Amino acid sequence: MKEGFAGLRGVALVVCASLVAGCVAPAISATSGLNGIEHILVIYAENRSFDHLYGLFPGANGIANASPRLYLQVDRDGRELATLPAVWRGKNPDPAFPAGLPNKPFRIDAPPINLPLSAPTRDAVHRFYQNLEQINGGRNDRFVAASDAGGLVMGYYDGSALPLWQWAKDYVLADNFFMAAFGGSYLNHFWLVCACTPEDHDAPAELRAQLDE
């Protein structure tokens, strides 16, 4: 579960995304093979990790495959956290989440929290440098430490009531889809389509990033 809602290292490095791909109207042609496909739709779920919504999907590489080696989070100095930090709502702890949650994934829509999918929660940070720190060389153990939402990044839902869940059953669910670029989904949209980073060589000076060396 990684990215905006991050969490399980190794299990879902889908930092920023779950992917559902399917062929529209799969029975429209008797032609076999690729020639029988008229359209392919890709649903790229922005700012979501795989486990955040699909961690309980039957047969998927999700929560059931998690082990402490894969999900335990550390602080910025590399020390294992005894418990998850508070879940933040603005500048204060969110009263909907109890303090001292165990250092592991937790259900948001189950006791003791019981927040439904319809309840808004904080949009966790999903920027380039924070994401680089969160992934931590592939260990994926600093999503909590480098988050502005505290322990929320380890939360997940039972997504079976969502229409997306049924679409995943009807078509294809990519449970080992990995993002191509650090940060949010906008840049990853380009990488999904063209495996490239867009550049504006004619951008005015005030819009160009200046590197301090």
Language model regions located:
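Bacterial N-terminal signal peptides that target proteins for export
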Residues: 1-12
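Bacterial N-terminal signal peptides
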Residues: 10-22
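N-terminal pro-sequences and low-complexity stem/linker regions of secreted or lumenal proteins
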Residues: 24-213
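A general, composition-driven signal for non-globular sequence regions
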Residues: 3, 20, 32-33
